[in-house]
Amino acid sequence: MNHAPHLYFAWQQLVEKSQLMLRLATEEQWDELIASEMAYVNAVQEIAHLTEEIDPSTTMQEQLRPMLRLILDNESKVKQLLQIRMDELAKLVGQSSVQKSVLSAYGDQGGFVLAPQDNLS
């Protein structure tokens, strides 16, 4: 049984999933990106399985090379966008931690409002 057409189709599907993930990351649709990750991983596993079953010819490897290049480029761009997002989240967590420390240090004043007073008498 010739699995070569199926392998080529699986690569095409992986390219589509890769492009979807890049679009979602570019549009900052993080929840959707995470949800699409499993389909991407499954597609990669299917390609690995099919590649083990057949030995792709040199011609087929040449046909697949541009798809692999595109997938790797997309993956690199998605990783860059994710790193930017992680940096943003780390900054927000840091700000939240500072706010919590300030509230903890100054917020528990027994219900009294501390304000400067005029004691010039």
From Swiss-Prot:
**Which controlled-vocabulary keywords does the entry list?**
Bacterial flagellum biogenesis, Chaperone, Cytoplasm, Repressor, Transcription, Transcription regulation
Instruction: Note one Pfam family from the annotation.
Output: FliT
Can you say where in the cell this protein is located?
A: Cytoplasm, Cytosol
Region entry FliD binding: which residue ranges?
Answer: 60-98
Give the UniProt record's GO annotations in the biological process aspect: bacterial-type flagellum organization; negative regulation of bacterial-type flagellum assembly; protein folding
- InterPro entries noted in UniProt: FliT
Carries keyword ATP-binding?
no
Entry GO terms, CC: cytosol
According to the UniProt record, where is the region Required for homodimerization? 1-50
Q: Which HAMAP family match?
A: FliT
The record describes its quaternary structure and partners as: Homodimer. Interacts with FliD and FlhC.
Q: What does this protein do?
A: Dual-function protein that regulates the transcription of class 2 flagellar operons and that also acts as an export chaperone for the filament-capping protein FliD. As a transcriptional regulator, acts as an anti-FlhDC factor; it directly binds FlhC, thus inhibiting the binding of the FlhC/FlhD complex to class 2 promoters, resulting in decreased expression of class 2 flagellar operons. As a chaperone, effects FliD transition to the membrane by preventing its premature polymerization, and by directing it to the export apparatus.
What the record says about family reads: Belongs to the FliT family.
Instruction: Provide the protein name.
Output: Flagellar protein FliT
The gene name reads fliT
